[in-house]
Amino acid sequence: MIAAQAKLVYHLNKYYNEKCQARKAAIAKTIREVCKVVSDVLKEVEVQEPRFISSLNEMDNRYEGLEVISPTEFEVVLYLNQMGVFNFVDDGSLPGCAVLKLSDGRKRSMSLWVEFITASGYLSARKIRSRFQTLVAQAVDKCSYRDVVKMVADTSEVKLRIRDRYVVQITPAFKCTGIWPRSAAHWPLPHIPWPGPNRVAEVKAEGFNLLSKECHSLAGKQSSAESDAWVLQFAEAENRLQMGGCRKKCLSILKTLRDRHLELPGQPLNNYHMKTLVSYECEKHPRESDWDESCLGDRLNGILLQLISCLQCRRCPHYFLPNLDLFQGKPHSALENAAKQTWRLAREILTNPKSLEKL
């Protein structure tokens, strides 16, 4: 048994050193190319409207606010200033979303974003995004990369298509530090020793982002309060949780397997599903020794089996916001197909680790 485990770990490490590192290098090259174009567009936006200041800065070889959705799809979060005069309200009525409400009606004129405040005192995510979309469309026509970049049509999101190969979504957002959403108040679970109190304090201090983007849990609902709502995002908190042991290596292998074998019709699976399942696996295996290099095969196998279970149940709860289903709106046939494909993949890896050379 131990020999079989060791063999699997050996082949997973080989896979990581060859396939995953090649994927990372290719994505890093793409990011540099894409960020040159996005920075140029945002510089042009800032000239037209100084309230939208580019926050796309490179630090330690990574860009703050940039998320890799897939090797050809990215999201850049554009942090806005001055959320000050608004209260953050998440009463759970909009899963995965919250609203920003004027703390005092008399402060309306003090807000940097006064024309985007609704009659009822909410800062409208939709109105800000609409204004930003107009500015980006103008900037695309003026910027020095105008021959290789165009706006993606038929969406209220701000999306750029670059060199007909890559899609980048630029999302206006507020960074919320030092507060924690009520809808995530159950976290961490009291009976689970992971993460330790110090890491919990770090994660909560890191806070979360409020994004101006279409909220999939509200698809089909048209009430104005809902279209004015902001989407909660915990990217930095999640990254912090997945430090240490073989967690990041495990996630990297899962992302590479997804890119190569689970990019399926209906797009049932993305990298965020993988990231979410790694967090759940950390809860199931709370000891640091469970994430030793020698356990890499066990952890990967556990996550793939959990993924199959989620696909068969057609439900994948968000790690911090369990009322939010990450499979919402995905076609059932696509989820079933993904379950079958994941099962084939898991069986292949477990019964014949050497097959990773071809996967």
Swiss-Prot record:
Annotated EC: 2.7.7.-
Residues involved in a ribonucleoside 5'-triphosphate binding: R23, K24, Y63, E64, G65, L66, K248, S252, I253, L254, K255
Tissue: Expressed in brain, cerebellum and skeletal muscle.
Localization (cell): Nucleus
Keywords: ATP-binding, Developmental protein, Disease variant, GTP-binding, Intellectual disability, Magnesium, Metal-binding, Nucleotide-binding, Nucleotidyltransferase, Nucleus, Transferase
GO biological process: anatomical structure morphogenesis; camera-type eye development; cell population proliferation; eye development; positive regulation of cell population proliferation
Keyword Magnesium: yes
Main localization, broad class: nucleus
Role noted for this protein: Putative nucleotidyltransferase required for several aspects of embryonic development including normal development of the eye. It is unclear whether it displays nucleotidyltransferase activity in vivo. Binds single-stranded RNA (ssRNA).
Subunit organization: Monomer. Homodecamer; composed of 2 back to back homopentamers. The protein may exist as monomer in solution and oiligomerizes upon ligand binding.
Disease: Cerebellar, ocular, craniofacial, and genital syndrome: An autosomal recessive syndrome characterized by moderate to severe developmental delay, intellectual disability, cerebellar hypoplasia with ataxia, variable microcephaly, ophthalmological anomalies, facial dysmorphism, absent or underdeveloped nipples, underdeveloped labioscrotal folds and scrotal agenesis.
Family label: Belongs to the mab-21 family.
Entry protein name: Putative nucleotidyltransferase MAB21L1
Taxonomy of the source species: Eukaryota, Metazoa, Chordata, Craniata, Vertebrata
Gene that specifies this protein: MAB21L1
